[in-house]
Amino acid sequence: MVWSRGQRRKLALENPSMQNSEISEQLGCQWKSLREADKRPFLEEAQRLKIL
């Protein structure tokens, strides 16, 4: 969620005609392609927010 919020806005601005479902699909592909090291800060932030 933490990663996708910022990415969703960026993708929507870059592709104004893209449907929300298409954006979600694209975000899923992008997330899966990230290395674990690149995902780690977002996963840690999500965990921190979950505790609050």
Curated annotation (Swiss-Prot):
Residues 1-52 bind DNA. Pfam families: HMG_box. It comes from the Eukaryota. Transmembrane segments: none annotated. One of its GO terms (biological process) is sex differentiation. Keywords: Activator, Calmodulin-binding, Cytoplasm, Differentiation, DNA-binding, Nucleus, Repressor, Sexual differentiation, Transcription, Transcription regulation. GO terms for cellular component: cytoplasm; nuclear speck; nucleus. It is found in: Nucleus speckle; Cytoplasm; Nucleus. GO terms for molecular function: calmodulin binding; DNA-binding transcription activator activity, RNA polymerase II-specific; RNA polymerase II cis-regulatory region sequence-specific DNA binding. Its main location: nucleus. Belongs to the SRY family. Transcriptional regulator that controls a genetic switch in male development. It is necessary and sufficient for initiating male sex determination by directing the development of supporting cell precursors (pre-Sertoli cells) as Sertoli rather than granulosa cells. Involved in different aspects of gene regulation including promoter activation or repression. Binds to the DNA consensus sequence 5'-[AT]AACAA[AT]-3'. SRY HMG box recognizes DNA by partial intercalation in the minor groove and promotes DNA bending. Also involved in pre-mRNA splicing. Interacts with CALM, EP300, HDAC3, KPNB1, ZNF208 isoform KRAB-O, PARP1, SLC9A3R2 and WT1. The interaction with EP300 modulates its DNA-binding activity. The interaction with KPNB1 is sensitive to dissociation by Ran in the GTP-bound form. Interaction with PARP1 impaired its DNA-binding activity. This is Sex-determining region Y protein. The gene is SRY.
